[in-house]
Amino acid sequence: MKVIKTLSIINFFIFVTFNIKNGSKYSNTFINNAYNMSIRRSMANEGSNTKSVGANAPKADTIASGSQSSTNSASTSTTNNGESQTTTPTAADTPTATESNSRSPPITTTESNSRSPPITTTESNSRSPPITTTESNSRSPPITTTESNSRSPPITTTESSSSGNAPNKTDGKGEESEKQNELNESTEEGPKAPQEPQTAENENPAAPENKGTGQHGHMHGSRNNHPQNTSDSQKECTDGNKENCGAATSLLNNSSNIASINKFVVLISATLVLSFAIFI
């Protein structure tokens, strides 16, 4: 901005000096400059007004000479009329000076301050902020939350309910409600008794798997857990510790997220350096 302003000011003064010294010889070289077009118009208007004043001045002398010749040819009584004629052209030439002063001032100082400011301030501030905020915050959260919570619950439910609750879960909720309504119509107290040992059976098989005191419980736990104990996180999920389920997967996801965040930081820093180098 400072360089552009200084160059425009220097160009303005150079153009004024050439017009003062050489007239209109160098006027064709500054046609493309917008700042100098207004100055040319003002100088052209002033030059035309001064030429009109110079052209009208000798005409007044000719009118005065003509009036004197008419007075000399007519008689001595017409001298008063001749003098009145000599005074009238000087009064008629005076309005030309007023017209030359009324056109020049409002043209020179309008175009120089209206074009430069709106170009530099709009482009530098609009490109950098939307890159940093949108991409970095939209990719990291859905990776960690969805995968860790979606894999652990189906492992625990299928193993514990494989003994007695499998046929109840395969049927839909509407079929269970229809069966319960039919049983309630036939006997009100009958279905309550077999449901309680089923819940007890669901609670009892989890105990030998966790403790491992008897041989039968130990073998049963080893058969069920041998193909699934490939990592420590799945052991903790089968034991019932839901807090530690998916810990290894979350660590891997965090490492991938850290790598992606580092890439975004490098890209953002590169764009900022390029923007500063271009605009500064």
From Swiss-Prot:
Keywords: Cell membrane, Disulfide bond, Glycoprotein, GPI-anchor, Lipoprotein, Malaria, Membrane, Merozoite, Repeat, Signal
Pfam families, A to Z: MSA_2 (PF00985)
Lineage: Eukaryota, Sar, Alveolata, Apicomplexa, Aconoidasida
The protein's name in its UniProt record: Merozoite surface protein 2
Signal peptide: 1-20
Known glycosylation sites: N22, N36, N168, N184, N229, N253, N254
Region (Polymorphic region): 44-206
Xref: InterPro entries: MSA2
Residue numbers spanned by region 5 X 12 AA tandem repeats of P-P-I-T-T-T-E-S-N-S-R-S: 51-74
Listed Basic and acidic residues bias regions: 170-182, 233-242
Sequence repeat windows: 105-116, 117-128, 129-140, 141-152, 153-160
